[in-house]
């Protein structure tokens, strides 16, 4: 196309008042489909709450889960729903409420980190279609998959300079590094929110650079309570020691007086 032809078309378009179609506004944010199991639901909330704790010093991020990500007009019109189980978007307005993640309302920003909580019925999609979408369209820097029912299932990829996913190598504990967040992602054995009722599960958790577990709000509260109880116990012991010392001093003074000595002169 010549410069002259392009200019003529621009003039014609301006003359007709043509404007590019506006993004759709009748977006659906809930398809009524719950997460696979209660364990999947708790696993998602654990990741969200852990991210909120780990990034508490920042305000320019959003952590969410099980919500739709809208990235194109065609996708929205086709009702081609894509909802990561967990994601974090950085360098965004973290004060806004979100029913979903609409990229054209977020200055074109996509999630920086995504975790899909797999099951036997979704593994092929999480490793195939979704992985390709997050790599080629979202350009999500760090992508992970994990089946809460399979402790050995954790895998992850990081986007290289060519915008292609490269598999992440696990450390000696089987954890994977998340460059975007500056955190480790690995399993933790225990009970969370009364799940399971007996025994333990292998939950996917965040760890800091020093490999310390990022605590959940209830774990922080429990730790603070334990510290408060320990401080109270120490204070009571100190009070008892002081009372015992005072009692010994009084007995000694009485004994000295009985011997005709003035305890104040000794």
Residue ranges and their predicted role:
Residues 45, 49, 65, 82-88:
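N-terminal, well-ordered alpha-helical segments
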Residues 62-64, 144-147:
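A structural signal for short, well-ordered beta-strand segments and their strand-loop junctions
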Residues 57-72:
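A short acidic/basic microdomain associated with nuclease active sites
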Residues 41-54, 62:
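A structured, charge-rich N-terminal accessory region that forms the first stable segment of a protein
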Residues 2-36, 53, 71-84, 89-113, ...:
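C-terminal interaction segment
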Residues 141:
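Short acidic/polar active-site loop segments enriched in Thr and Asp
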